[in-house]
Amino acid sequence: MLKGLKKALKERFCSQVYISFNVDHNLLSTQVIRIKNDRIKEKFFKTFETKVETKSGEVPIQALKIARSYSQKYPYTYFSAMSKAKEVLCEKQAFEELKKENYPACAINQKYCVYVESEDFLKDFKRFKVQDVDFLFSPFSLIYDFVRDSLEEKPLLYLLLERSRFYFLIADKKEIFLAKSVFLEEQPEEFIESKEEDSVEMNDEIMKAFLSEIQEDIDSLEEAMGLDRSKDNKEKNEDAYSLIEGMTNIPLIANALQEGLRSVYHSRDIDFVEKVILLDSCQIHQKALMHLQETLMMEVSRLDFSLVERLNILARMENEKHAF
């Protein structure tokens, strides 16, 4: 009873602030939500270039100032981020039997979890010099929480796409068959070592053939980029870069997904996966999306996905679980 009273007083008279961070490519995204008496009093989203001045990590000083101003003004401020370390999918029971005390684990559902080596886990924390990261979530927890109410009896492939990396999960209502992350860009040395099994490369012949195939699209867009610098042409410029970047990554993404599917078909008795659900956090170009669908020869359904928004949703859920 006392616990419930404390919780009610806290929610009624104290603001709770949730601040989430995510670094992708050369941008840091953050969402700030302030809640009081079960009502959202303040909510905003900001992006910062990580190439600008930073302090002992990847968070720009401007973002640090926002974070610290809220934490100083509101005692109940919680920070969340997404793990970028290599994670291993495991059944919870098997993980407990392994007795890996120095391997932090993150639950995906009631049956499965992912764990990371303590060294990689600490590197994740060092990336965000805010105060403490209260909640560090697995990308696979974010994926599963987003799709769990729409899981089907047959297995589907769920793909979370960022500019610098992507994550995919093969699952149905009962099982998770595979969870894997793949880097599209070289990672900072202080963050994670690049490992051969986690990288994807294209040989010169495949790259030349692919670029030749999309050259007409690139030429027409580059022509638009060379016009006078009006507002419309700035949008065309951004559209061109989005297409070129997206189209160049499609063979890499498709190859990794096909490898993952082959490994699951070889090791598990499951039906063929016929559909990909793309959780798009980087606004993939429509032509790149169509190219992915054609390359995989599978239906690809795209959903808008805000990483920082989902991080704050999970942080609020976790905070509710452990509230006094």
PLM region descriptions:
Residues 1-324:
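Hydrophobic/aromatic-enriched cytosolic interaction surfaces used to assemble or bind macromolecules
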